[in-house]
């Protein structure tokens, strides 16, 4: 249906079919391949988390018992397969398919985010050829439910390649990699960040120290000779100030403002905890600041005096001009969100790992952007104007919006 509930309208937008050579001609593919090996999977943690998410929602998954080849790539035994031949295929497909880009509607109640592989950062391949699926399904084990998957993911370990008993480069690709580094730093271990070369933006530590975290986290790592790697020592695990800490309630349950009225603060707190950072509501005790809420006066002063700061969301971005002269922030009228291809104009330690992993898709919620920045600013990421977003709600139904 379209915005006016006309049955069958815009079917090509909302239910496109796989009509390529040898493909099934359906909206649903045959299956999805989600690698669980370090050679074919950039983010092992996110892939394992997705396996648990799917089965927690009653989707059945399979794991291959032998290697197989699809589209010229060989996948080992232990690769996850999400079949579309099951009762809950719409649950799985709704999370994994590449989404719908809506331009012609005037308004949308809420974002319709899909493409979990892009938003969560794991590698995935869509299979739409029945012949290929027949070969893949032939090497699959029995369907797994949530209990089966929990046992399976608990048995997964970090991926290591290269020389043992030297130094180890840990790929900076997930919450787990950051949490592992924070654990090492808090234990007084030496960890560096690689400053140049193929591993720029990744972490480096000793093999012995790597082994203390490799069993706890799902990491991708490579043994290297440290003389071939340039790195800067990370002096400590930073304490992070989270903006927008809500005051306690004077009546009733004191934490009501934190639990039910402060979504941004809650998300930021959860994210920092997942990555192993110590957090504080006192900016004078912080080594860095981050958050989705506009900075208060004390935090703003600290940032102006040099405190590193990561701000996102409308609240933070629209107030950037309070911190940096010459910044202008613009929002697209009526737009909701999109998954958009991006480019990286400048390679720095902030974005080097994204560049190395070929991660050129960014999820933008609210569709605000910096329409003007100072000439001296280093731009880390920009939307790629030569490509079309794959998913989202960007209305172009009026001349003003289309412009």
Segments from the language model and where they lie:
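Intrinsic-disorder/low-complexity accessory segments
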Residues: 1-403
